[in-house]
From Swiss-Prot:
Segments on the Lumenal face: 24-405
The protein's name in its UniProt record: Glucoside xylosyltransferase 1
Sugar-bearing residue positions: 202, 243, 277, 372
The organism of origin for this protein: Danio rerio
Cytoplasmic side: 1-2
EC number of this enzyme: 2.4.2.42
Length: 405
């Protein structure tokens, strides 16, 4: 009788352990593991035939549209640049990509996350660029994609689609490194200069970002935030250079669990804890994460993410004064309003530039004339910082281009 009872008890224990295992796997798949691995082949591909283990749990299947199928460029030399476009961001994202491909000499692959209605127009613009420009880049169009269970919450955090960038390490699983920028960004220096900063990371660093402010008297986080933030004045998420491999495997310290959590395990609990205390959405979550993990951040100088706050109350970005602006970030819509005409002048100069025209005459000289009309504003008085960086880029390109090409 005892033998039967022991056997019965053992069966019960095995059954309970099996149930626990099954539920744990279900919970794991419902949030992070279900993100589909997005490949970036050099030819158009459908994911309908993907294996079951790669099945996406996001609301929309991923679709690749990659240009230049016969490009000889090797995968390992590509610089990967990502952006997220929703709403009225079509013009911005195309202009941002235009600045990147105009000033860079290395091959680029663009990863563009966009709503379905924007994908067609973005594709049409990129496909219309001349062949000598298309030979410098390839691109992948991705749909906006969030975990099923919390899609609505993530998609409406701060601005529509803004929090998509939080999920890039899980979606772009085949990539080792990535440069993410907001759509309202213009490159005034080649992408390779910031991309090469990956080699400057030490053994603990996995992301490079610029401070939110340089001047404590106008800093948001140190004066108004109701949550932890990185460093003395926080960091800005408009430009992020990421080692995705490290981000996927690292366990992040936090104030919720005694042990570290992986990136994909951390995001939802963090939002649930702080959603009533955050103002700037996903940027605030990033600040909270790196408040507890400051050793993981490589600090970019402010001229790699130059915003109106760096000049609107007087110049407060010393690297820009010394070397010029390298990346211009027109946040708060200043590229499309009259609030900061100097920022708008740079945006319109690139927008009106035609590929193949002389950069000095058709871009730089016209921009200098337009900026001279903005000197009645604080940022207009500092607008020579904008052209200093661009002049360096133009000279570099002209030296690299043989006469007659």
């Amino acid at each position: 009788m005892r033998i039967y009872l022991r056997t019965f008890g053992l069966c019960i224990v095995v059954a309970l352990l099996s149930l626990v295992f099954l539920f744990s796997k279900h919970d794991e798949g419902s949030f992070s593991a279900g993100f589909k691995q997005v490949r970036a082949p050099l030819q158009q591909k459908s994911f309908n035939g993907a294996k079951a283990k790669q099945r996406p749990t996001a609301t929309t299947s991923h679709r690749d549209v990659v240009q230049n199928p016969n490009s000889p460029v090797q995968e390992e030399v590509l610089m990967h640049l990502a952006a997220v476009a929703c709403g009225e961001r079509h013009g911005e994202v195309v202009n941002m990509l235009k600045t990147a491909v105009t000033l860079s000499q290395r091959a680029l692959r663009f990863h563009i996350f966009a709503e379905q209605q924007l994908q067609t127009s973005i594709k049409a613009d990129l496909d219309s660029w001349p062949a000598f420009i298309q030979g410098k880049f390839s691109y992948v169009l991705h749909p906006i994609s969030f975990p099923h269970e919390h899609h609505e919450e993530w998609s409406q955090l701060f601005k529509p689609c803004a929090s998509q960038r939080l999920f890039l390490p899980m979606i772009l699983r085949e990539l080792d490194s990535l440069l993410y920028v907001d759509t309202d960004v213009l490159f005034l220096q080649p992408v390779e200069l910031i991309w090469d900063m990956l080699m400057l990371f030490n053994s603990t660093q996995l992301i490079a970002m610029a401070p939110e402010h340089e001047e404590p008297r106008i800093a948001w986080y140190s004066r108004f935030s109701w949550h932890p933030y990185y460093g003395k004045m926080g960091i800005n998420s408009g430009v992020m250079l990421m080692n995705l491999t490290r981000m996927r495997i690292t366990q992040f310290k936090n104030d919720m669990t005694p042990v570290g959590l992986h990136w994909d395990e951390l995001l939802m609990p963090l939002l649930q804890k702080y959603k009533l205390n955050i103002t700037w959405g996903d940027q605030d979550l990033i600040n909270i994460i790196f408040h507890y993990n400051p050793e993981m951040v490589y600090t970019l100088p402010c001229h790699w993410n130059y915003r109106p706050d760096h000049c609107i109350y007087g110049s407060n970005c010393a690297p820009a004064e010394d070397e010029g602006v390298f990346v211009l970030h027109g946040n708060r819509g200043v590229f499309h309003s009259d609030k900061q005409p100097a920022f708008r002048a740079v945006y319109e100069a690139f927008e009106q530039y035609t590929f193949g025209e002389d950069l000095r005459q058709s871009l730089l000289s016209r921009l200098e004339v337009a900026l001279n009309e903005t000197t009645h504003t604080y940022c207009g008085k500092a607008s020579h910082f904008f052209t200093t960086g661009l002049q360096k880029s133009v000279r570099r390109l002209q030296r690299a281009t043989p006469p007659g090409d």
